[in-house]
A protein has these predicted regions:
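Intrinsic-disorder/low-complexity accessory segments
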Residues: 2-32, 36-42, 46-613
Length: 613
């Protein structure tokens, strides 16, 4: 499918470029294919970002011989020389086409950017207004990522009224009526619709038992992935707006010194970064699993208190410096008295330390999942990671770590590494074992038994019937085509593959692992749907919402929508002194689900503190 923000002119230019490449490929006898696998829908591709900026872009992909010569199954050969030649031909053919008509290509580029302004200026959703009251760090970070791409973002002051609402904490505003308006629309709109005729064809293919033709995700709205509250409207008040620069520091919220100590509200990824930086600097903090109120301010579950009595005299200046560098909120505490909730000597508070984290790496793990996870931990949260090769996991001294993470796998990592006994002992001794996506099924296998869940098969109308033995079977009459289809349906089939949608996950707010959340947006891909944990085995800390409220963005097959409802997103199961945490979908996919970074911190930072109680 094509992204609807690609213009007809751009598609015509792509065809023009392709036709000249085809002419040259024909001259050299080079076979090629187009349009069969890849799409032009998701904006994260190397050709889609320039396209949505007004360029004419496309991807050339050449099969690799994995060396100098590759023998195909049909007996023909693919050589390295051919690959080089084909890339040169396609590149020079592109240059030739544009050189013949360069003035009109430049004219088209200018027209694309002018029309983006005109189109947005007339739209009812011209302005995107992002609330700074919640997920402030994610909203501020998103604004800077947009500005770094040349998109203008403005800040409006606290108390201003926009889109008929008052923004007590202020807001960030993006006007789509700018040259990159189509890129803005693609990145920030809640959803980008698939062409109706394409959807109809995919549903028809599924009915015929064929695979769908979606290459990648159908959802990517950046505010939704970042957990940022936003709305769109036709008019806003920008009379007091201030433009944001890409290198502007995120404003910190720091005020005064505290005689008793300092509190860090556990509300977003920036707050987690501040706590982690403070722990890394050697300061001692305690986290609460129950909200408390001091001087009228509610500090949610997960919030951290750094008491002056537990720390050196540099506590105040250093925390202030870290909060300023990160752009976090730090509140001074004059005394330990609270109006509501637990006092700081309560068992609700757990002492924290800088977690020592190991990550399964290399053979058997998904390279992208392992890399995404390491990036989120090290670059987004500031937690060093020790990668452990799968081949040595069974021999590694896991007592050196507080947390072990198994990212998404291709299956068999635990068996391949012969690490089941090691992992069980690690958890029993107080460790936090975290698994993502397919790794959950490895820990749930009978051989490992660390998660009391199972993968589900697809829901089915098929009647398995009685076992039939011998060379013949009783006769059947099929009265309708539906009877026939039901009879041949594979009752052992897995759920339909989901290319990628954003769905709503509801939090069990009584559990420490849900600190900072009432709900979250999760990216769901693949076929894996798990059974919920029984209450006697553990907790379903996040479950997917009911079928009517499940889908946040993207296109989801109806069968999956019904089956995914109420199923677990995050599970926690205690064994001995430790805990096993299963994310049925990866929270670090592409390292762009910034709204889940706080949840990752819950598992990696709060988890060891809770297990040490």
């Amino acid at each position: 499918p094509f992204n609807p923000n690609i213009t007809d002119t751009q598609r015509a230019r792509q065809t023009q470029l392709g036709q000249n490449m085809a002419r040259w490929f024909d001259r050299f006898g080079t076979a090629y294919f187009t349009r069969e696998i890849f799409d032009a829908f998701y904006p994260g591709y190397g050709d889609m970002w320039p396209t949505l900026n007004g360029s004419i872009a496309m991807t050339f992909e050449q099969g690799s011989p994995r060396g100098l010569i590759y023998g195909r199954r049909d007996g023909t050969l693919l050589t390295y020389n051919e690959g080089v030649r084909n890339n040169v031909i396609s590149s020079l053919a592109t240059v030739e086409t544009v050189a013949r008509d360069k003035a009109s290509y430049l004219t088209d580029y200018a027209a694309f950017r002018r029309s983006a302004i005109d189109q947005a200026a007339r739209s009812d959703d011209r302005y995107v207004v992002m609330d700074l009251a919640n997920a402030r760090y994610e909203a501020e970070s998103l604004a800077r990522r947009l500005v770094s791409q040349g998109i203008a973002v403005q800040r409006v002051p606290a108390g201003s009224s926009q889109c008929r609402n008052t923004y007590a904490a202020g807001a960030l505003v993006v006007d789509k009526a700018q040259p990159q308006g189509r890129l803005i629309k693609t990145l920030l709109d809640p959803s980008t619709p698939l062409p109706p005729e394409f959807i109809a064809e995919q549903e028809s293919r599924r009915d015929r038992g064929l695979n769908h033709e979606l290459y990648d995700t159908t959802a990517w709205s950046m505010p939704l992935m970042d957990g940022v509250s936003f709305e769109q409207c036709r008019r806003v008040d920008l009379s007091n707006a201030i433009p944001i620069a890409a290198n502007d520091p995120i404003p910190a919220k720091v005020s005064g010194t505290g005689g008793f100590g300092y509190a860090v509200p556990w509300t977003d990824g920036g707050q987690a970064r501040l706590v982690i930086a403070a722990l890394d600097a050697g300061f001692v903090g305690k986290t609460t699993d129950t909200a408390f109120v001091q001087r009228g301010r509610t500090f949610p579950s997960g919030s951290v208190v750094f008491a002056a009595a537990d720390n050196p005299e540099t506590l105040g200046p250093e925390l202030t410096r870290l909060a300023t560098e990160i752009g976090a909120e730090l509140l001074p505490m004059a005394s330990s008295w609270v109006e509501d909730g637990p006092n700081f000597g309560s068992a609700s508070f757990a002492a924290m330390k800088m977690p020592r984290v190991a990550l399964a790496w290399d053979s058997g793990t998904s390279p992208t999942s392992a890399g995404n996870t390491r990036f989120v931990l090290e670059q987004e949260l500031g937690i060093p990671v020790a990668p452990i090769r799968v081949s040595t996991l069974g021999r590694a001294d896991l007592s050196l770590y507080d947390v072990v993470i198994i990212p998404d796998t291709f299956g068999g990592v635990v068996a391949q590494s012969r690490s089941a006994d090691q992992l069980k002992a690690f958890v029993r001794d107080g460790g936090v074992l975290i698994s993502f996506a397919t790794a959950v099924s490895e820990l749930a296998s009978e051989d490992v038994g660390l998660l009391s869940t199972k993968l589900e098969l697809a829901t089915s109308d098929a009647d398995p019937g009685a076992e039939e033995e011998g060379a013949s079977a009783p006769g059947l009459n099929f009265g309708t085509a539906q009877d026939y289809e039901a009879h041949i349906e594979n009752e052992r089939a897995r759920p339909e593959d989901i290319p990628g949608v954003l769905v709503r996950a509801v939090a069990n707010t009584d559990h420490w692992l849900a600190a900072g959340y009432d709900s979250a947006n999760a990216m769901v891909t693949g076929r894996e749907i798990y059974r919920p944990l029984n209450a006697s085995d553990g907790a379903n800390v996040f479950r997917f919402a009911d079928a009517d409220d499940l889908l946040v963005s993207g296109y989801l097959w109806e069968e999956n929508r019904l089956q995914l409802a109420y199923k677990p997103f995050v599970m926690a199961e205690r064994h001995g002194d430790g805990v096993v945490i299963g994310f049925t979908q990866s929270p670090t996919t592409r390292a762009y689900l910034n709204g889940l970074n706080l949840l990752v911190a819950n598992a990696v930072v709060l988890g060891p503190a809770r297990m040490a109680q």
